[in-house]
Amino acid sequence: MQRLVATSVNTVTLQEVEKPSLKAGEILAQTLVTGVCGSDIHAVQGHHPFVPVPYNPGHEVVGVIRELAPDVKGFAVGDRVTVEPDLPCWDCKNCNSGQENLCENLKFFGCGYTQGGMADFWTLPATRFHKVPESFSDEAAAMIEPLSTPVHAVKLSFIGSKDLTGKTVAILGCGTIGLLTLYAAKYFNAKTIVMTDLLEKKRNLAKQLGADMVFDAASKTLPSDIRQAVGQSIDVVYDCVAIQQTVSQAISLADKAGTVMIVGVPAKEVTVPLPIIQDHQIRIQGSATYLPADYHDSINIISQPSFKAKEIVTAVFPKDQAQKAFDTAIAGEQIKVLIRFS
């Protein structure tokens, strides 16, 4: 079988490897499609804070079950599936309190793990699998994992409320995670949704998919422009870029008493105006991956007629063009790039 390996900075190659053997409690799946995530881009460029090259990429994976260990129940050969790629220890404080996404001994399939989803076959514990609804295309199914990340972030931002009813929110970045955050914010009843991006075509797509207002992220007067347009500060800002410029913009937009959610994966450290954060009671909240309930919400969102997977998945490459797929994703002109394995 073949597995894609990020062998060095900006280089991925298909390698011949042995098919993984099945262990107790595991499922062996064959890959259909895998998404190139923003974290894959950071990692292959040598910028990811926790995933050095070489590594085995691929965690936004959709596959078909080919084998099951005898003790696995609830699944069958032929089921189409996606996975929760985080692999908790199930024994630490956080795992025992329902926060297995924050496991103190966490491993992550496709991010520094011995296997990744950019391979013909792979194995994982059955506890990490979710069945894909028959009505979903492979492209729509490939959105379940990445959508679960903003779903988790949006739910963390409720702060005692049941949803976003009455809230004005801003989403910084109109890439995959930004657009999926748009869907999550709409699903949880945000009143007004403002989005920003450097690229006009991405801003136009955000508007097409339901953003109330869009703004050029390069504007030097962005925070004041948005404040003037919405008539108030922003209740919740979802930073899906997580660079110095967007973090600074987010804090300005949330001033005063707002919340800033860090949704994107930062490639490096940033600085924040701590006196303003303290004095103006601005809340900055990180958000790490997801929980099983977030997958259920994601499936519900994708099931809605308003969800347009074809508008988000803008490029699909066969596995023998994986280098081109990564180069295309790195260039930043596309939204979501997929690699098809079978």
Residue map of PLM features:
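Nucleotide donor/acceptor-binding cores
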Residues: 1, 166-167, 191, 258, ...
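Mid-domain Rossmann-like dinucleotide-binding core that forms the NAD(H)/NADP(H) cofactor-binding site
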Residues: 136-219
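C-terminal hydrophobic helical "lid"/dimerization subdomain
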Residues: 248-252, 292-342
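Residues in the short beta-alpha loop(s) of Rossmann-like NAD(P)-binding domains
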Residues: 198-199, 266, 290
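Glycine-rich cofactor phosphate-binding loops and adjacent beta1-alpha1 units
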Residues: 159-165, 204-283, 323
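NAD(P)H dinucleotide-binding glycine-rich loop of Rossmann-like/cofactor-binding domains
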Residues: 89-172
